[in-house]
């Protein structure tokens, strides 16, 4: 966690590229980001990966709510298939928290793992109809994720 009281709380928002329920994502972000602001008494700064789906909704959210944000795009030309995990690692390094909308995709799983490797707490929100859309859990270590991911 950043110690400077003037610095914002950096929150990565990530999830599937094909998930487009704007209203659901916005409602979750309103609640979780409000809790983070209240807990730390600091503004938030959103980090998103520049992809379609949840990333695009997070960017739209930041613009509509006048929240500062950073877009960290994957360099697919330079890094090929490793570009996504590299980008996720970079976003995790920048973050105090991650909010990941999850339905079992590799990219979202990579974001969760990269954040947990760097000791960044992750809110995982199910967007899987199999598990139940909207179920939330906070994870703070890889061991818990290894167990919990089987439930998703």
Regions found by a protein language model. Name each.
Residues 2-11, 18-145:
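Acidic/glycine-enriched connector segments
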């Amino acid at each position: 966690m950043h110690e400077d009281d003037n610095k914002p709380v950096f929150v990565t928002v990530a999830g599937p590229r094909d998930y487009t329920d704007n209203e659901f994502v916005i409602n979750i972000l309103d609640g979780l980001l409000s809790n983070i602001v209240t807990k730390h008494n600091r503004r938030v700064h959103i980090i998103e990966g520049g992809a379609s789906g949840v990333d695009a909704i997070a960017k739209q959210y930041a613009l509509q709510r006048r929240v500062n944000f950073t877009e960290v795009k994957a360099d697919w030309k330079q890094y090929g298939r490793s570009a996504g995990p590299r980008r996720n690692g970079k976003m995790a390094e920048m973050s105090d928290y991650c909010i990941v909308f999850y339905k079992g995709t590799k990219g979202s799983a990579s974001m969760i793992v990269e954040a947990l490797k760097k000791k960044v707490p992750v809110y995982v929100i199910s967007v899987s109809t199999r598990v139940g859309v909207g179920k939330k859990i906070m994870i703070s270590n890889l061991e818990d994720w290894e167990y919990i991911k089987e439930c998703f």
